[in-house]
Amino acid sequence: MAPSKQYDEGGQLQLMDAERIEEEEECFESIDKLISQGINSGDVKKLQDAGIYTCNGLMMHTKKSLTGIKGLSEAKVDKICEAAEKLLSQGFMTGSDLLIKRKSVVRITTGSQALDELLGGGIETLCITEAFGEFRSGKTQLAHTLCVSTQLPIHMHGGNGKVAYIDTEGTFRPERIVPIAERFGMDANAVLDNIIYARAYTYEHQYNLLLGLAAKMAEEPFRLLIVDSVIALFRVDFSGRGELAERQQKLAQMLSRLTKIAEEFNVAVYITNQVIADPGGGMFITDPKKPAGGHVLAHAATIRLMLRKGKGEQRVCKIFDAPNLPEGEAVFQVTSGGIMDAKD
């Protein structure tokens, strides 16, 4: 494997040592290891062609979907799954073991200490964090800041990894990354080189981009996936109540894929969401809004953040839903250097 890169405190790229690379590889078992269990290399290649690059990812597929891969019979799929189960521990574990496993979670700084404290340390890996709010509420600005902070070393509250950015609204600006990188004392060109970007134009294109990400994440140390915004293309490609059921089904499939990516490669998934009018929001609430996507999106996102505008460049983040965080709010500020603590 070619040596990977990381930043020192001065922002310069440094080669990661072999021990660090081994730690990254321990997050998942390569699909190539099936060969040692008696699986034909040709069948392994078929799995890779279908976008399956790890044994962890393989076990996240149903046998029905695996038999849909050209050249894989039911007998072959049974044998492949049996071999993967031998390489992985997929059964029950104790709460203590799960607590130890949770120590692999990386929390990536948002750039604001107040916001980090609200989130228990930052944006978590192994789960989906959703931020929703009106336009100019800070969703995309937070995404740009995370593009940089993710590349900081672990001891600087970063993720020590690369970033994948799927843009559905055309709002990503590479020139915005430059002053944010300078704020963190990092080389802007090196930071941009560690961000892979794709513009999605249809919900199908968006889903296919996610399928192609597995190959890159299996080879390189990614720590963050951003989808900005997750719902925009679904609202365009499906219209009216007649297509609502199909839209929600396709949305559920894409969100399931995001969850699998988060857990398979130990990456943080940050998605932004739009808001819609809420007729049942209550007569005492001025212009009530709720996140788009309905129950499907509500159940898929592990942590849901509601962003709203404050005074001037200040923004307010509220914990809308989280399994391990108490309700609360934090005020932060949007500056040329990205997300920062609000100034009085």
From Swiss-Prot:
Alphabetical keyword list: ATP-binding, Cell cycle, DNA-binding, Meiosis, Nucleotide-binding, Nucleus
GO cellular component: condensed nuclear chromosome; nucleus
Protein family: Belongs to the RecA family. DMC1 subfamily.
Localization terms from the record: Nucleus
PANTHER family xrefs: MEIOTIC RECOMBINATION PROTEIN DMC1_LIM15 HOMOLOG (PTHR22942:SF30), RECA/RAD51/RADA DNA STRAND-PAIRING FAMILY MEMBER (PTHR22942)
Species in which this protein is naturally found: Oryza sativa subsp. japonica
One of the Pfam families matching this protein, by short name: Rad51
InterPro entries reported for this sequence: Dmc1, DNA_recomb/repair_Rad51_C, DNA_recomb/repair_RecA-like, DNA_repair_Rad51/TF_NusA_a-hlx, P-loop_NTPase, RecA_ATP-bd, RecA_monomer-monomer_interface
Molecular functions per Gene Ontology: ATP binding; ATP-dependent activity, acting on DNA; ATP-dependent DNA damage sensor activity; DNA strand exchange activity; double-stranded DNA binding; single-stranded DNA binding
Gene Ontology biological process terms in this record: chromosome organization involved in meiotic cell cycle; DNA recombinase assembly; DNA strand invasion; mitotic recombination; reciprocal meiotic recombination; synaptonemal complex assembly
Residue sites binding ATP per the record: G133, E134, F135, R136, S137, G138, K139, T140
Its biological purpose: Recombinase that may participate in meiotic recombination, specifically in homologous strand assimilation, which is required for the resolution of meiotic double-strand breaks. Exhibits DNA-dependent ATPase activity when bound to single-stranded DNA (ssDNA). Mediates renaturation of homologous complementary strands as well as assimilation of single strands into homologous supercoiled duplexes leading to D-loop formation. Binds circular single-stranded DNA (ssDNA) and circular double-stranded DNA (dsDNA) in vitro. Catalyzes DNA homologous renaturation and DNA strand exchange.
Tissue occurrence: Highly expressed in spikelets. Expressed in meiotic young panicles.
Binding locations of ssDNA: R235, F238, R241, R247, R315
Transcription regulation is among the record's keywords: no
Name under which the protein is recorded: Meiotic recombination protein DMC1 homolog B
Binding-site positions, dsDNA: R235, R241, R247
